[in-house]
Regions:
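Helicase motor core with emphasis on the C-terminal RecA-like subdomain
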Residues: 2-15, 22-25, 39-40, 46-52, ...
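N-terminal pre-Walker A segment at the start of P-loop NTPase domains
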Residues: 21-35
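Walker A/P-loop
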Residues: 62
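Conserved nucleotide-binding/hydrolysis modules and their immediate coupling elements
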Residues: 474-584
Length: 585
């Protein structure tokens, strides 16, 4: 069984002693001293110990994870010993977060290189590569030719890379693996990642040190086991960094909830007054459609206060360029208010926020804390948040969540177990890479926390299903792998195996999206649901990214539109999923 230990804080002078002079000079030019998470984490990572660091948002967890790794790579770079391989993998559940880390990792490295030039110290170039769903084909090809030393990616992209011989060769001696925002993986994406981490272990000739970063969650022991897996020879240290941050959280009712006559007007008047009282406000809704609706209403109800230069919508259906532009404008203080669904919940750096508004119940105290942590992102600042409730159910839920937050009670995370759909997908991906002995495959899967108690019969049922032992031809479901019961081996079947795998990877609910482009410039704006498009006719006006567009025509998988400013939307809203209520709540 996996052994768990409690981390102990180390002295600042002990950490300083292991830092390369360039890294030390850079660090103390930015920070006065080591933060609490750094005193718990840096030395353990340097000593190659698996560690889970749990601390509130804004407590420098990410830098804690990277500091020892950057230090190690700078030492190798000075000795001209950097090889063309991946030394560290950083995986996060958000594409936006990966982009942010990429940016914030490159900048410290560039500053360290400038210091080296001033001191006439020659350093090899430390390469950082970003591989997500947004990465272009050209960038992927460039990465395949020359491996990055630090790979920033998502769980799904990492699984894809582990089916590619070139990248598996680059990962043969990977030394570090950072799993950020681990609390956001208490779902089938987490289950998927748990096997991907075991695949990474199998691909590497050495054990990749696991570094887990999490907001304040419980139970930490189970999360730590999820990080390193289940085996007698595995150990993990837990750094539960308790940092008491001042919290100012209130539940505000929008008008009279008994007489629900004119709540819309009351809601936007209340929002406007709260926004005006603060410098920068971040508003969370629970769906993309609500995000668009709020931005549109604020623009129409208060046209002199809110325009494209002061307010923006942010969600996953916007184009990469639009998302990055909004994040940058928010970070630099150019926007007064940003409305988002869940896309800015996690630890992406968005600059100074002094108020977080949560429209309706966030459905769990853990999510509410994560959202609240965006306000006063630095530790010494007060996190100020307001729940705006629109009905009595919301009032009860938000009241309970507020009480849990004030009492420091955290919703427990639960990782699903023995998900056979995820298992089928992972086995298929592994068979694409190479021929496996089924007993070795079963042992690898059993090391995953989420499959440590997987019945052998269930495993072989999945193998039989993938091998086509079930008569499913009438449903156009055919064998994906071959299985030889005599030799106990499996492998891929068919020339289209990789294409099938790549086009069906992951556990994020499938949505059929159509790209929205401006006419005649062909500039991508975002994407809309196919079902939403079916309801539109030529000339309809809809909202995307807080801006209004007139639908012109559809060509292939693209919708062509032109911007409008004086017309109101003619089609109500588009579709997106609601958030689930947490089990504890």
């Amino acid at each position: 069984m996996t052994k768990i230990f409690e981390a102990e804080a180390r002295e600042g002078k002990e950490i300083t002693k292991i830092l390369h002079p360039l890294v030390s000079e850079w660090f103390f030019s930015k920070f006065k001293e080591f933060s609490l998470p750094q005193t718990f984490g840096v030395m353990n990572i340097w000593e190659r110990k698996n560690i889970l660091i749990s601390a509130p948002t804004g407590s420098t967890k990410t830098l804690t994870a990277f500091l020892a790794i950057i230090n190690y790579l700078v030492m190798l770079a000075e000795k001209n010993q950097l090889e063309d391989r991946i030394y560290a993998v950083y995986t996060s559940p958000l594409k936006a977060l990966s982009n942010d880390i990429h940016k914030n990792l490159i900048e410290p490295l560039e500053e360290i290189y400038r210091l080296a030039e001033l001191k006439n110290i020659k350093l090899q170039k430390i390469r950082v590569g970003l591989r997500t769903g947004d990465t272009t084909i050209a960038e992927r090809a460039k990465m395949a030719k020359k491996a990055p030393h630090i790979l920033v990616t998502t769980p799904e992209s990492l699984a894809i890379l582990l089916t590619t011989k070139k990248f598996v060769d680059y990962l043969k001696a990977v030394e570090f693996c950072i799993v950020d925002e681990i609390h956001a993986l208490d779902n089938k994406r987490g289950v998927y990642l748990s096997i991907t981490l075991e695949r990474l272990n199998e691909a590497s000739v050495i054990w990749p040190v696991k570094i887990g970063l999490s907001a304040t969650i419980a139970p930490l022991e189970e999360v730590a086991k999820f990080l390193v897996g289940i085996a007698d020879d595995r150990e993990v240290i837990i750094a539960d960094v308790k940092m008491e941050k001042k919290v100012d959280i209130k539940v505000l009712s929008v008008g009279n909830l008994i007489d629900e006559g004119n709540l819309g007007t009351s809601l936007y008047n209340l929002m406007d007054s709260l926004i005006k009282e603060h410098k920068t406000t971040l508003i969370f809704t629970n769906t993309r459609s609500a995000t668009e609706r709020v931005v549109n209403h604020l623009k129409e109800d208060f046209p002199t206060e809110y325009g494209d230069d002061t307010i923006a919508a942010h969600h996953s259906s916007l184009s990469k360029e639009h998302r990055f532009d909004i994040e940058e404008r928010l970070r630099t203080g150019k926007l007064k208010v940003v409305v988002c669904s869940t896309s800015l919940e996690l630890g992406i750096d968005i600059g100074y926020i002094d108020l977080v508004i949560m429209l309706s119940s966030p459905k769990s105290s853990a999510r509410a804390l994560q959202r609240l942590g965006r306000a006063g992102h630095h530790f010494h600042e007060t996190a100020k948040g307001r729940f705006l409730v629109l009905d009595r159910d919301d009032l009860v839920e938000c009241g309970v969540i507020q009480k849990e937050m004030m009492e420091k009670k955290i919703n427990r995370v639960y990782f699903p177990k023995n998900c056979l759909d995820v298992l089928s997908q992972q086995i298929y991906g592994m068979a694409i890479y190479k021929i496996w002995d089924v007993n070795e495959l079963f042992s690898l899967i059993k090391n995953s926390y989420c499959y440590s108690k997987l019945p052998r019969n269930d495993f072989f049922d999945v193998i039989s299903y993938l091998a086509g032992d079930y008569a499913l031809e009438t449903n156009n479901i055919y064998a994906k792998i071959w299985y030889d019961a005599k030799t106990g081996q499996i492998g891929k079947k068919g020339k289209m195996a990789r294409v099938l795998y790549l086009t069906n990877i992951g556990t994020i609910p499938e949505e059929s999206f159509i790209t929205v482009k401006l006419s005649p410039s062909n500039e991508p704006v975002g994407a809309i649901d196919e079902g939403f498009l079916e309801r539109m006719k030529k000339g309809d006006v809809f909202v995307l990214g807080g801006k209004k567009y007139i639908y012109l025509y559809t060509r292939g998988m693209n919708v062509y539109v032109k911007a409008t400013f004086d017309r109101s939307p003619t089609i109500p809203s588009w579709f997106s999923e609601m958030l689930p209520l947490s089990f504890d709540l």
